[in-house]
From Swiss-Prot:
It comes from Methanopyrus kandleri (strain AV19 / DSM 6324 / JCM 9639 / NBRC 100938). Residues 459-510 are annotated as: Disordered. The gene is rfcL. Belongs to the activator 1 small subunits family. RfcL subfamily. Keywords: ATP-binding, DNA replication, Nucleotide-binding. One of its GO terms (biological process) is DNA replication. This is Replication factor C large subunit. Residues 493-510 have a biased composition (Basic and acidic residues). Part of the RFC clamp loader complex which loads the PCNA sliding clamp onto DNA. GO terms for molecular function: ATP binding; ATP hydrolysis activity; DNA clamp loader activity. ATP binds at G48, P49, P50, G51, T52, G53, K54, T55. Heteromultimer composed of small subunits (RfcS) and large subunits (RfcL). HAMAP family: RfcL (MF_01508).
Length: 510
């Protein structure tokens, strides 16, 4: 069964998702070779994040121009002798193929119809200066003397020597956008006859973080068994937020030499204890030889012991240095034969179980919050004491659903304002849950009416009090005004009396 990543690998540069600038620059460089001239630089270095189409672009380019392809990747020895024999003095495709066989390499050969041969060196940034002694120096010399087009591929070009970077034309592949990945996933679903929800494809694309290869692997893992992919499928895999990176890390651990495998966890945002679970689950899938499996588990068990000592002693080097070295380099060193190549990795069973029960835990937490609000208890007590009692009561009625029992459950569910999903969780029977839910709706409506009437009565009572208070205020105001008026009258009368008793002078008689 061909993995979808290989099945839907682009056959032409036109099929490559996005990367318009990179495709244009790459095609212009290839056209110079096709016209019979030797461009300078003679090699290109395709660099960018994983899953952006670098290696696929090289094969698509060769297909467009009818070139054969000879690939050296990280699983091959890339010592000075091998590189010199393969690409050092190459001038024609036949001499290259002959040198490939003489070098004893197992390199992929893509049939074409041209005299040119494209030499592809993948994961150049993974060449180890100790294990592949002299490889980088020989590669730099081969690039400068190449008589055939050479394509180098790297995730991080800046770890390469400046001499090699100066000898190539660097072409950047940018991280893919979510919409680009969604469109590619949609085409695969349509070709495979997969039923899909648009939101599910978008969630897969977001989790991939610009890595189309990882997104396709994710889609295949979800859709191939059932023929469909829904948002619930993706939602249930909450523990898979870092799974794409984990896939890449596992690939390095099981396929790379120990020194390269050691770097597998450097950029992995995952707890080493979780990585141990992933490796333990997939050792039998990656290794077939019983001795290799035994050695791998032995290294892994030692890693687990060191990780535990970190907690006991507080010295975290046990976990993040010694344990990680054992679970990466150790497991890689357990392999004595050829690398397994592509492996369909599986998540740990315990994480899968947590993923499938995640929704149940969410429902239980939601019920506990409603109980805590209504009964004025803590959420913890609601979970431990109340929910278990409710489950017994609901399931007992579900086993023998009488009208009386359904009415009681409806009253409880209505009072707690439980949703149909929450009632179904307590009942365990969807049909009974529906009947209880209908009764609960009626109870909730009655409770709403009671609350509305109570609120209305309270409002009317408050308004009545305000009216009474207003009337009292008006009476008090009238009394106050009457008192003030009486006081003014009294003052005027007193003034008149005082004026009538004044003593007259002689001037008043003339």
């Amino acid at each position: 069964m061909v993995p979808w990543v290989e099945k839907y690998r682009p056959r032409s540069l036109k099929e490559l998702v996005n990367q318009d600038e990179a495709k244009k620059e790459l095609a212009a460089w290839a056209n110079e070779w096709a016209r019979g001239s030797i461009p300078e630089p003679r090699a290109v270095l395709l660099h960018g994040p994983p899953g952006t189409g670098k290696t696929s672009a090289a094969y698509a380019l060769a297909h467009d121009f009818g070139w054969d392809v000879i690939e050296l990747n990280a699983s091959d020895k890339r010592t000075r002798n091998v590189i010199e024999k393969i690409v050092g003095g190459a001038s024609t495709s036949r001499s290259l193929l002959r040198m490939t066989r003489e070098a004893g390499g197992d390199y992929e050969h893509v049939e074409g119809h041209s005299d040119r041969v494209l030499v592809l060196v993948d994961e150049v940034d993974g060449i180890d200066p100790r294990e592949d002694r002299g490889g980088v120096t020989a590669l730099t010399r081969a690039v400068r003397q190449a008589r055939n087009p050479m394509v180098l591929v790297a995730n991080d070009p800046w770890v390469l020597p400046k001499s090699l970077r100066d000898a190539v034309r660097m072409i950047e592949f940018r991280r893919l956008r979510v919409n680009d990945i969604v469109e590619a996933l949609r085409r695969i679903c349509e070709r495979e006859g997969i039923e899909y929800e648009e939101v599910a494809l978008r969630r897969i694309a977001k989790r991939a973080r610009g890595d189309l290869r990882a997104a396709i692997n994710d889609l295949e893992a979800l859709a191939r068994p059932t023929g469909r992919v829904t948002s619930d499928d993706v939602e249930a895999l909450g523990w898979r937020d870092k799974e794409i990176t984990i896939f890449e890390a596992l690939g390095r651990i099981f396929n790379k030499p120990p020194r390269q495998a050691r770097r597998a966890l450097w950029n992995l945002d995952e707890d080493p204890d979780d990585v141990i679970l992933w490796i333990a689950q997939n050792i039998p899938r990656a290794y077939r030889d019983p001795e290799e499996i035994a050695r791998a588990y032995d290294y892994l068990s030692k890693a687990d012991v060191f990780s535990s000592r970190a907690i006991e002693t507080g010295d975290w080097r046990f976990k993040y240095v010694y344990a990680t070295d054992l679970m990466t380099s150790g497991v890689a060193a357990a392999r004595k034969g050829k690398p397994p190549g592509f492996v369909r990795f599986q998540p740990p069973k315990i994480l899968r179980k947590l993923g499938t029960t995640r929704k149940e835990r969410e429902v239980r937490n939601s019920i506990a919050k409603k109980i805590a609000e209504r009964m004025h208890v803590s959420t913890r007590r609601a979970k431990m004491d109340v929910i278990s009692v409710l489950e017994i009561a609901f399931r007992k009625v579900a086993d023998n659903p009488t009208d009386r029992g359904l009415e009681i459950l409806g009253g409880i569910a209505g009072y707690l304002e439980l949703s149909k999903r929450e009632i179904g969780f307590l009942c365990g029977d969807p049909q009974v849950a529906q009947r209880v839910y209908q009764r609960a709706l009626r109870v909730r409506e009655k409770l709403r009416k009671i609350r509305r009437e109570r609120v209305k009565g309270a409002m009317e009572s408050m308004l009545e009090r305000k009216r009474e208070e207003s009337e009292v205020e008006e009476e008090a105001k009238e009394i106050e005004e009457a008192v003030e008026k009486a006081e003014e009258e009294e003052e005027r009368e007193e003034k008149k009396k005082e004026g009538g008793g004044e003593q007259r002078t002689l001037d008043a008689f003339f």
